[in-house]
């Protein structure tokens, strides 16, 4: 069993056994009912990408290309436009979070990246001094939250560090997430930011190192318990999936495309499970 599958099953068991139920929940299902969840706090995982440990489960199929396209929308296009996400990338799952009739998700994610010129600053800082301890992406912007409505960022902070091992430089990343839908979004979010880490590493010709993943509130919604039990019953694939970025070292961050990524040795258990999202 892969490390990701072991962690996935352990977290499902912990939530079902030790978790507590939410109170005064904000999300709603599409039928209007309150989307309560069972949750644990303070979840942490570590993956050594350089040793082939990737945070993707084999217990169900994960839409990795759509996940990577979302990252490009946020950090390359630096956009909150749903039209761009739909037309350029054929990704539609953000449409349920449209703010009014604006055609956007509000001043969130890519809009914050653009507002503060975050990616250019990170690349400039890493170029000037890779060993500085201030390479932080933060999407938590109270001023923007007051400016428009919209879902507050779930994956809101990423930190980068480098390590020299022998003659190689490794880029490590730490993703902090305030809230995570364990069964639906856990591995999507993790692999998105692994992809971002790989893009930055390629930009500088570095190797990818470790990926650290902290989640404050890790939950399973109350309409997902049957799917959770099914995932626990499933036997994972024996293969260790790995994501590769097929571009030369030194490729500009903004020139990398979703098609440049390839997920190898991925043979997830089927059929896919159905989930009704909480909005």
From Swiss-Prot:
What Enzyme Commission number(s) apply to this enzyme? 2.1.1.45
Q: Which UniProt keywords apply?
A: Cytoplasm, Methyltransferase, Nucleotide biosynthesis, Transferase
> One biological-process term from Gene Ontology?
dTMP biosynthetic process
The family database entries (PROSITE patterns) matched by this protein are listed as: THYMIDYLATE_SYNTHASE
Q: Which locations, inside or outside the cell, does it occupy?
A: Cytoplasm
Instruction: Report the catalytic activity.
Output: dUMP + (6R)-5,10-methylene-5,6,7,8-tetrahydrofolate = 7,8-dihydrofolate + dTMP
The primary site where this protein sits is cytoplasm
Q: Where is the active site?
A: 154
Tell me the route in metabolism or biology where this protein functions: Pyrimidine metabolism; dTTP biosynthesis
Q: Which residues form a coiled coil?
A: none
Q: Which residues bind (6R)-5,10-methylene-5,6,7,8-tetrahydrofolate?
A: 181, 278
**What GO molecular function terms would the record report?**
thymidylate synthase activity
Which InterPro entries does the entry link to? Thymidate_synth/dCMP_Mease, Thymidate_synth/dCMP_Mease_dom, Thymidate_synth/dCMP_Mease_sf, Thymidylate_synthase, Thymidylate_synthase_AS
Binding sites annotated in the UniProt record for dUMP: 133-134, 178-181, 189, 219-221
Q: What family does the Swiss-Prot or TrEMBL record give for this protein?
A: Belongs to the thymidylate synthase family. Bacterial-type ThyA subfamily.
Q: Give the multimer and partner information.
A: Homodimer.
Describe the function of this protein.
Catalyzes the reductive methylation of 2'-deoxyuridine-5'-monophosphate (dUMP) to 2'-deoxythymidine-5'-monophosphate (dTMP) while utilizing 5,10-methylenetetrahydrofolate (mTHF) as the methyl donor and reductant in the reaction, yielding dihydrofolate (DHF) as a by-product. This enzymatic reaction provides an intracellular de novo source of dTMP, an essential precursor for DNA biosynthesis.
Question: What's the name of the protein?
Answer: Thymidylate synthase
